[in-house]
Amino acid sequence: MADDLFDFIETEGNFSQLLAAAAAAAEEEGIASGPDGGSQGSRRRGSSGEDLLFGPGGLFSDDAAEAEAAVLAAAAGATRPPRPPSAQQQRHARRGSGEIVVLDDEDEEEDEPGSPAAGSPGRALHQGSEHGHLVLGPRSRAGSGPRPPTPAALAAAEAGAPGGPGRSSPSAASPASSSSGSSGSSGSPGPSAAPRRWSPARGDPVGEPGPAARPRTPAPPAQPAAVAAAPARRGPASPASPAAGPVSAPGGGGAPSGGGDRGRHHHQHREPLLDEPAAARRLDPRPLGARSPVSSNPNSSSSSTTTVAVEPVARGPEKDEDGLGLAGDGGAPLQRQPRRRRAGEGALRRGRGFSSSSSGGSDSDLSPARSPSAPRAPAAAAAAARRSASSSSSSSSSSSSSSSSEGEEDEGVRPGAPLARAGPPPSPPAPAAAPRPSASSASATSSSAAASPAPAPEPARPPRRKRRSTNNHLSLMADGPPPTDGPLLTPLGEPWPGSDPPADGRVRYGGAGDSREGLWDEDDVRQAAARYRAAAGPVPVFIPEMGDSRKQHEALVRLIYSGAAGEAMSWLQNPRMQAPDQRFNQFCQRRVHAPHGHGSFITGSVTPPLPHIGDAMAAQDPLWALPHAVSAVAMSRRYDRTQKTFILQSLRRAYADMAYPGRAADPRAGEATVEALCARVRAAFAAAQPGRVPRELADACVLACRGVLERLLPCPLRLPAPARAPAALGPACLEEVTAALLALRDAIPGAGPAERQQAADSVALVARTVAPLVRYSVDGARAREAAWTYAAALFAPANVAGARLAEAAARPGPAEPAPGLPPLWPEQPGLVVPAPAPAAAGAPSGLPGSGPSSPASTKSGSSTKSSSGTKSGLSGSSGYASSPAAGPDPAPERRKKKRRAPGARRPGDGEEDEGLSGSALRGDGHGHRDDEEDRGPRRKRRSLGLGPAPDPAPALVSSSSSSSSSEDDRLRRPLGPMPEHPAPDGGFRRVPAGETHTPRPSAAALAAYCPPEVARALVDQEVFPELWRPALTFDPAALAHIAARRGAAGAPLRRRAAWMRQIADPEDVRVVVLYDPLPHEELCAEPAEGAPRPAWDPRRGGLSALLAAFAHRLCTPDSHAWAGNWTGRPDIGRLNAQGVLLLSARDLGFAGAVEYLCSRLGAARRRLIVLDTIEDWPADGPAVGDYHVYVRARLDPAAQCAVRWPECRELRAAVLDSSSIVGPACFARVEASFARLHPGAEPLRLCRQDNVRYTVSTRAGPRTPVPLPPRAYRERVLPTVDGCKDMARQRSALGLGDPDFDAGAAFGHRAANRWGLGAPLRPVFVSCGRRGLAELRGPEGLPAELRAFCAAALLEPDAEAAPLVLAPGALAAAGAPPAVRWDFAPFETSVRAAAGGAVETHRPSGARGPGEDGEDSAAVEIVGFRGGDGRPRGPLGPIKVEAISDDEEAEDAGNPYLLLR
């Protein structure tokens, strides 16, 4: 019968006729039940057939047997007792109250034998609810449409006459069942009423529990709850016509009806009271005015009685919003919504629909487990407990009956939404996961609840607003935020569906639970996985085959919280890819995305850098969803950049506690960010005021930079331009910068890649700006760290470690630093120098009374490091016997190569010398050995005995047998410890007091001392000019070197002392230029035949670059200015005549000479100008006091555009100029200082072509000084062709077919005859500034007008011309590009120059050659390659005669040299 009725309902949808038939049968039989369960003798008037459907024993009641009996009684008039419930009926009775439960195929089970539903085709209709809910099973297997009704069912339903197989009296129902009486509306639908279909209330879920409701314990199926039948209505109620009349119940009064326009489409609710039990807080699904108070017993410990009414609704043709297609006259019949079940979804799919669950009265609404902000873990635990308890059954119990309906789009009832009804005061709270009560206890509970009085009627509330229903159970949320602790679970506290690991050989792809085949064996994937493992940040393309996505997720989160606001979003949308990443991205598009549908196909990630969202769901980590949210916003086209930035900032703030969980309790939470600290550094430099910077303050800045770099490693560093000039920095600026760096060091942990890059850039900016203040060396700052002193002592050899540690402990503590700065030592300790002690036997030092602990025995502290990495010893120990004129050795056995003293090496200084007997002192002190020593030891040394003997060094002076022997020993060992009162004419370093421009020497260098008589004996030689000999006494290292070569002033020593002959009198020195030559570059040495030539270095300049700057010319590998092309020493006489002294770091007495000049001129109240071009400052270099003028510049061959951009032809003659590079701007500073210090002297001319002359090989001879003046050129060339009548030979000898200029110098006959052979073309200098030179990346960075000017300009040689410096913004003042004009030929305007193997023809602007009408005069035309004439043969023009003689009045008749053209 039930099957027939279901078929009838599905096919015809005439639910109202069924109700009418049931009402007619009820009128005949008088079916009604009282509160006590007995049958009513008389049926109340106005009740409808819904009592037979939803009342006790009705079709949709709890018991299937009673339901079927009631329907049969209504249709056929037969009466029979109900059958006991089957297992399936009991299972469906636990499905939850008042629900429409859509079952999947796997929910169906075999019914027990004898069950009415067993084997019945109508088992799709289950009566398994506590309070009469509708349970729909799977559709027919044959098709998706409903099954046709049977004729018997149709007839029985329409006529309402007897026709069923037996009738059962309603009085035979269980006596425990109860029904609350209700009074119907004014009219009940009869058989003639219009057909209506039953549907739940549109828009509002029925029976939804409140946010604080606890899981209810279902009542046993044998004790069905009372159901109040709602009267049927045809249409919506009007304000004048209420939806229903008052409803009465035993023990309670009628509730007033709440009218309104919405009528039956809304439910009336009120807010729950805190003193009401949870059993009474039920959603009343009845229409307005059709409710009755809930009958509950406040004395009962658990109550499960709930009133539920499902009303029939007449809807229009539109589809119901819940997507089930229930309403509407023309709508589709009731069907289950097809859906795919996921893993872990068992409890979720059973709680769908309209539910009104019950729970024990002991459940407290104030329990934190069900509070709006509490997690749902107790619900999940209760569900798991009930599933384990009912393992014999295939479906779990309704532990999730408290889940929200499908109409809720957020968790829980929204703020302002009506809540469940309130009841009596709450009972004591119960445990969160209480066991399910038995059937007997539930029955007793139901009975006691039914007999309890109902509360007072509730007032009417405004109708509840509609909400759009969804079909996704995951949208069931609760009020308030989700749990903030623990894993992120579903709203029901279960794992996310589809988060299980994919099957073997597959990876996540697509929707939840979907996967694809893995591609681990592809080469592209393996390479991408290797890059992913090695990457420090996020990779631009990620797929699951590359490895664990945790690293990528965390890197993306760091990226979002780093850098500017829009950088992360831009990178996520369009990640910057290198070539391998681009190839891998194409591979993924071809092999991963293309086989899986179109562009809108669900992939689980938005952009290539994002891993699949299933990894975040499986990890249950909400922080991993942040990159997906940011990427989704970035890909949206509905926001502009500012709006996206706002959303990103909102997400960053919302996720901040998860991304940085310890920041709230971190005391540094309020400190500035990395970006703000970097801006603070830049602002400090921008606001710098000039002032004298103490050296310890600069060292503190260096230490702060080192601290930041220590936190950043590894980090990509870029070399920026200095922010300010050294003279513009003041102490306040450095204090602010150092404090910002210290704060930046502490802010580095936790910073993202972009922030780390900003910090690295800031450190590089500070380093390049402060580097001139520390003389481009960190040794002084490192020596100020106290920890290094102790570390050097601890790591020293055992025989000196104790003494060094004691000395370190005895040193004074660090000085009080400035506020916010690290502590600094009062002086640079360098290597700890223990106190002098009596030397022991066998000590290798040659100093009297010195041992391993003597200051002079520490060669690292008393050596001078040159640019090539070699060092000169400070003491003349142990090497004097190797000298050819050393005389007899009192200890022959000491000629054997001695071992170095333990601990004599300075930590971190690299390879050391072997004393003065090593290569550094056997040669020129720079690693160049003497020629005579390269042949090995002398024969005389071999004849001496080599037997072992104790070292008599400590007693050489005191125990010598003769005075001559004692004198020789003193000359061989000139240095000793510094006495308390050194003699004024002794040999020692004289460092001025106060601040210095350059680093101060180490303590060991300052402790070396040579007695005056020994010093005079050593410097009294012809190789040293007399006026310069005092300069050597300022350098103990030079005295030690002279002592090692005493009596043998060979070529190396003479070469190193040749600088003394540049200017005869030190009083005439005005400017000292310090430079560091490249290997094999010599200023005062003749290049030997077969000697190694210097190697060209485009990144480092040496002597060649310096002289080219002074000579106002270019220096390229094929030019005369390059030292590799020299055949003799260059001539710098014009510079020396102006008082300019060039001093190399390799020269003998380099440090002493500078300090001597500073001391001598400073004592005369004269200031010395020091131009420093040394990049690698040598150890123990000269200390220049701040009294003198100090100018710092570097030599950079790449400043020449021909070297910087060799492919750019138009800028071959251009040179980039800046005050930080040796050139016109730097020379202008020196010249201005000179004019200020010497106003009456001749002004300096540091950038002129006659300052330097080179000796090179030309056609005039192998050693030709260039530029060779025109007269000297003719004197050398013309005699070779005198009397020669062979014109071809004359042409070849004079170079008539050669270009005018080659490699920028005059080469052809007519150019050499006019300007001199080798006269260079002048370059064009382009002023860029300090910052502009560093930021200039290519020739495109220069204005096009400037490039055109440089291409057309041709500056003819001029020995007295000043440099032409152009500013990119001041080209208008430069006028037309200069050009060469031949004054002897009216039509000869072009200049032929060779460069790069090609010959180019340059014509001045506006000039035209013969027959060149309309040709671009500024064009550069390549007419041929070198080797031939190369000139195009035009029409024969008039014969031109060139006067070779200087005599302008000479007659051409006697001149045999006529040039034909």
From Swiss-Prot:
The keyword Phosphoprotein applies. Residues 270-285 have a biased composition (Basic and acidic residues). InterPro entries: Herpes_ICP4_C, Herpes_ICP4_N. The keyword Translocase does not apply. Residues 25-60, 75-518, 811-1002, 1395-1461 are annotated as: Disordered. One of its GO terms (cellular component) is host cell nucleus. This is Major viral transcription factor ICP4 homolog. It comes from Suid herpesvirus 1 (strain Indiana-Funkhauser / Becker). The gene is IE.
